[in-house]
């Protein structure tokens, strides 16, 4: 059965709205930026990691988007003032509750990792403003000896966080398009892509690095493989719907037609994947490592990932099993 209502953001079966789409988008940026930074740090012998802009980007992009996303989630609750119950009363049969627990553990390890890296800066601030907290230095010294395990665990948690955004939607079993096993992998790949794009913007704009810097060359290694992976997972996602029969075929038709079809083909496929992919494959090195060119491609990438979150969330709720 095809749809007979034209309003894209207000459909009869809508459970989750744009707040959740933005929440998923922000978590993806955090996940991707942290994975990239840990990969960079472990593949380079950095004398002072706190001065490296990829590491700095992870400290900001890993924490700020996640906290903003959590704030949005809190105010999305029917009773926001009861959020503390969600934070400390875990329900192991609730995907949302498990996500909150994952967020807490992830933030704990991220804070520990950042504390070790920015130890000198933190201790300088403590000695200047709050000398009584000098004991924090001893705690950081202990964490410093555990840097290796902390980084490995944080990398795994970041990857799980990226995949969790897909698990969250796939838990809506009454929606054929969302109840799809490919979603976690797709959201992990697209989240990593958005983390890479956000890191590029951070190091080039805030860090004022050159387009042909060592950091830029390192990040470029991951762009094309991630985009190709994302494209492949999208194909698997739609092929699964096509051969799923029944309401899955209806869900596919409804999703790729009308307003949300345009969002996918223009926002996700063209702006988010094809243009950045061709730009990386076809551009000469003089253009590929041009600062303004990288910024433009990164913006396209972020637009595409945001459109994908909106498309999956809203188009996925158009059809009920």
Where are the regions a protein language model picked out?
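Long, contiguous internal "core" modules enriched in hydrophobic/ aromatic residues
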Residues: 24-29, 43-45, 109-287
């Amino acid at each position: 059965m095809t749809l007979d209502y034209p309003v894209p953001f207000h459909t009869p079966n809508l459970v989750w709205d744009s707040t959740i789409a933005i929440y998923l988008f922000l978590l993806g940026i955090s996940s991707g930026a942290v994975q990239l930074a840990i990969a960079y740090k472990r593949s380079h012998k950095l004398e002072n990691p706190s001065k490296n802009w990829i590491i700095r980007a992870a400290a900001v992009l890993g924490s700020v988007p996640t906290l903003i996303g959590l704030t949005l989630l809190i105010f999305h609750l029917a009773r926001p003032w009861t959020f503390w119950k969600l934070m400390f009363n875990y329900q192991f049969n609730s995907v949302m509750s498990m996500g909150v627990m994952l967020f807490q553990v992830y933030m704990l390890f991220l804070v520990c990792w950042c504390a070790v890296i920015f130890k000198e800066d933190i201790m300088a601030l403590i000695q200047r403003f709050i000398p009584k907290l000098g004991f924090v230095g001893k705690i950081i010294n202990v964490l410093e000896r555990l840097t290796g395990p902390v980084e490995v665990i944080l990398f795994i948690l970041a990857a799980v966080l990226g995949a969790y955004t897909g698990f969250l939607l796939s838990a809506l079993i009454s929606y054929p398009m969302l109840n799809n096993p490919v979603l976690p992998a797709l959201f992990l790949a697209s989240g990593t892509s958005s983390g890479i794009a956000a890191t590029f913007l951070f190091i080039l704009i805030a860090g004022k690095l050159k387009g042909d810097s060592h950091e830029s060359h390192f990040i470029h290694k991951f762009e094309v493989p991630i985009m190709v992976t994302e494209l492949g997972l999208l194909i698997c996602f739609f092929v699964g719907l096509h051969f799923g029969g029944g309401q899955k075929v209806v869900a596919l038709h409804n999703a790729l037609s009308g307003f949300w079809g345009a969002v996918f083909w223009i926002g996700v496929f063209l702006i988010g994947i094809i243009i950045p992919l061709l730009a990386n494959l076809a551009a000469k090195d003089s253009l590929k490592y041009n600062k303004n060119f990288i910024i433009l491609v990164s913006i396209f990438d972020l637009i595409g990932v945001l459109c994908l979150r909106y498309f999956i969330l809203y188009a996925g709720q158009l059809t009920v099993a």
